[in-house]
Amino acid sequence: MPPERRYQIALCVLYTCFTLLRFRYRRAARAQIPVPREDNGDAQRLGVLIPYEVMTFFLYLLLPRTLAWAAVPVPAAVRWAGAALGCAALVLFAWVHRALGANYSWLLQLREGHTLVTSGPYRWVRHPMYTAFILLHMAAALLSANAFLGLTWLGGLALLLAGRVRREEAMLTEAFGTKYKAYMARTGRFLPGVGRAVNLAKARTHGSKKPSQG
């Protein structure tokens, strides 16, 4: 079997497992009380990003020569590290869904009786599901060793999350007030410990700007 075929199979297995996992929890979410669809542009952006990723994914699998011009030399160990990263992303997805329970929604909406989840991975990170998406996209970039696929997938995800995260945090701040602000102060947005480090840096900056007494 050609070495490239092994990477293609690994990527295919990862995204098949991801699709099955998401389908399971989305189906459960649809069975709950329906909510109005969001109207903030995310649906339109997803309507472009998802078909694009599916198209380039199958181009890489079935017609790899069409993307060969963007192939980059990546050591085998690094590419297989991408597979391990993808497995970690799948585990994180499952953990996130288990922590969210009935609070999960693929829409940027709060359901009736929505609670602030601070258990599981949410104990350290405010948006662990987005972290899992980032890890999965990084895994695809490493496994495919294709600059075009990796950069456009990660770039598209970054554009989507840039606005969505701000809106989500504003929505949760409005809903939970000081409780969510305190939660933000002790957690990172995508990585654990970053929030606290940022707050300490801000405190030191403000402290250094205080006028000296003489």
Which residues does each predicted region cover?
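Membrane-anchoring alpha-helices and their flanking helix-loop junctions
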Residues: 1-118, 136-214
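Histidine-centered phosphotransfer motif of kinases
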Residues: 119, 123-131
